Amino acid sequence: MQIGAQFYTIRDFTKDLDGLSESLKKVADIGYKTVQISGTCDFDAEWMKEELRKNGLKCVITHTAPAKITGETEKVIADHKTFGCDRIGIGFYDVAKNGVQAFIDYYKDAAEKIKQAGLRLSYHNHDAEFVKIDGKLIMDHIIDAFAPDELCITLDTYWVQSGGGDPIWWLNRLKGRTPCVHFKDMAFTGKERHMAVVGEGNMNFDGIIKASVDNGVEYALVEQDNCYGEDPFDCLKRSYEYLKAQGLE
């Protein structure tokens, strides 16, 4: 299992191409070989291909705007193939508000086209997916509505726990369907929970790492939505060093 950097962590530094280019270099200098491109400025696919090449990086998944996934599916597929990325990610969809059927209707055709092109659509959870609709968790509704080769899950460990779920149980439940997982820790100050550098919070990352390996996770993508005034690159570095010490590459 390889350690990766989720660029949403450093989104404030990637608002233009110069910042994105510099951020790719800084992440590579930390030691990362794998990235998820998310929350950045727009870029040309050929430009990204070259930036990844010169920094020795591979993009294994993106978060792509929903309107592009469904309205410009062929272009999104072509762009991902250009810079060598096999997975097109959905960062957020308000299933609790819009309903499960609306989610299915919105993404089903795109999921099929992406599958036929040899890529995979992937859904990233937050905590709302652990609300029940008609006696069934939203996450289960989503999983059951799509075949594994139509939709994989970018399981976010922090948001699973925030929603009252057990990340290890869900890694077991989704065996073979979670090639990419977001590693994000949770800590508490008093009664207030907050996101933390991996290994510096309270989550059972020994167990999460073991379950990830046992269930075929390929990429552990470090994400920290909020660094609370700390340098996000330093947070990425500390998470990387912790995971390296646990035997990840």
Label for each model-derived stretch:
Residues 1-86, 248-249:
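N-terminal pre-domain/capping segments
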Residues 3-7, 35-37, 59-64, 88-90, ...:
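Hydrophobic faces of well-ordered beta-strands that scaffold small-molecule active sites
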Residues 5, 27, 35, 52, ...:
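Conserved, mostly hydrophobic/aromatic
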Residues 11-17, 34-47, 64-73, 93-101, ...:
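Acidic-and-aromatic substrate-binding clefts and catalytic sites of carbohydrate-active enzymes
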Residues 29-30, 83, 117, 176, ...:
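Structural motif
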Residues 48-64, 110-114, 140-148, 205:
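Alpha-helix-loop-beta-strand connector modules within alpha/beta enzyme cores
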Residues 116-202:
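Acidic/histidine-rich catalytic cores of soluble enzymes
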Residues 230-249:
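C-terminal helical cap(s) of enzyme catalytic domains, especially alpha/beta-barrels
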